[in-house]
Amino acid sequence: MKKNDYEKAVELLKEIVQDCKFKEKIYLVGGCVRDLVLGKTPKDIDLCIDYPEGTDLFIDFLKTKPECSGFVTYNRFKTGKFSLDIGTNEKIDIECVVPRIETYNQGPRRPDTVQQTNITEDAFRRDFCCNALYKNLLTGEVLDPTGKGLDDCKNRVLRTPLDPEQTFKDDPLRMLRAIRFACTKMFTISEETYSKIDNIPEYSALSMERIRDEFTKILMSKNAVRGIIELIGKCLMWRISKIFQLNIGFVQNNKYHDKTWGEHSLAVLGHVIQGGANLELRLAALFHDVSKPICYQVKEDGSFSFHGHDKESAKETRKILTNLKYPGEVIDKVVFLVENHMCIKQLYDYSRGLYTGKPCLLYTSELPTILRV
């Protein structure tokens, strides 16, 4: 969200709620407030309505306002959302919720009960203290119910309001979010919180779509290599790729590679990141040799060869990305790059120290795909 759009939206909301009977009980909440405290423009706007049945009443109130549209409520979770027209055909989607507590008995992110509560209890059910901040829409006062959120923003520390073991059990995706925050926002995960990030049983129940979204955010950060290393170190990479999790230290035993397979894969990822690579290139860089640990041949001298690893890696990459529910267009582009990465490599003549167009003759029709990616 652009800074100007955010400011327009907040000012318009202030005007709209002037005749709302619980206007003093409306707060900006979560990542929105965290970003403001950090001096950054929020990416989205979330509201907390600290009033009985606040979500439903607020949505009903907004239905009388021409600037608001697209109303949706989720009664079970006591949440809702709407679109705010800030002018010049610009609309911003805003989510709203009441303070709530949840109980989990049937697995992560499937609360058995959701009950309205007060802001303090709401704050302690959230993922991290830095996200448990509330800014009064009208007065601008910032509430820090955990007593740690403002300090954690200042010191860029990530810790959970409750015992991290319970916080991660309630929603194990928070473990991936912690690693993502460390990569994208340069937060340091507190020692206690970090020690509880692990391959807990609840992690197996997470949907692949949710894992994909966090994995993508990690991969698209400038510190993606660090993020992948953390995922492997905490035994969380297996939901993405078991081969990667189990074989990160695989020795290639080949005169062309002085790095382990894992070191090489991460080095290639780091290289394309420096060039500002998009998602497809980053995925291809990470998985271009993914099948090497399971398709090598032992030569007479004891060294390894990897004939056909490009084709096998392409097959495995398709399985990985399909399992993660990536769009077909993304999968096809990544698989093409992985399958042909040895051919692309041959465009460079190492003996003469220059690029040659000869291999392009074999891939003329596909070359535009490489350039588009």
What are these regions (language model features)?
Residues M1-S365, R372-V373:
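Catalytic cores of the polymerase beta-like nucleotidyltransferase superfamily
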